[in-house]
Amino acid sequence: MHNISKDVRRATRDLDLDFIKYSLADDAIINFISKLNKVNDGIIITIIGNIEKLHHQDYDGKRLNISLKDNYNNIIDTKLDIGVNKFLELEQEEMCFDLSMLDNEITLLANSCEQIFSEKLKSLLKFGIRSTRYKDIFDFYYLIKNKKLDKEKLIKCFDILIYKDDTMNENNIEDIIKRLDGIFNNVGYRKILGQANNNWLGLSVDEVTDFVIIYFKSLSKLSV
């Protein structure tokens, strides 16, 4: 979200990658990091400790604690979570980096705004008022308000990520709206939403949640 909004309040140090047609085995991951270090871009990546298996919520993958060091000896310690992209039918945005030093070509793809929105929504629908990803609600508002979303692409993402997932209870926009209404009208949840550390837009909770619901109602005409 920081890359989209350019707002420091949505910045994070943690990194996430999904492999496409590449093994998640530890030795394959170590080889991948080794290849990146051969790019000669002035940054060296060091894996700290053991590679951990991740299995939480609806995510399976591996976690690496890594250290990034540049030519000026600046060091940043962070986490890198690596999963597998299971949704190849979703359109991705290609990111260009000079990786010509590598023997084999690597293409980095970024999730579209529609996929980012849909994955945040899926998590909220699944966990309801138990979800602790409060900033996601304000992310919804930002993406909608700033016209970052294509409605047709968004509906396609809903279909693939939510409607066709047997673990989800929502099969259409009406189901989503009903679920969101229940979440947004929970007094305890709304109180936490309003806290300054969650409300990165500095707007009233009423304005944000009402705006999001209105947008979802506008999608009902486009539902698959």
Feature names for model-found ranges:
Residues 3-9, 19-224:
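Structured mid-to-C-terminal alpha-helical surface segments
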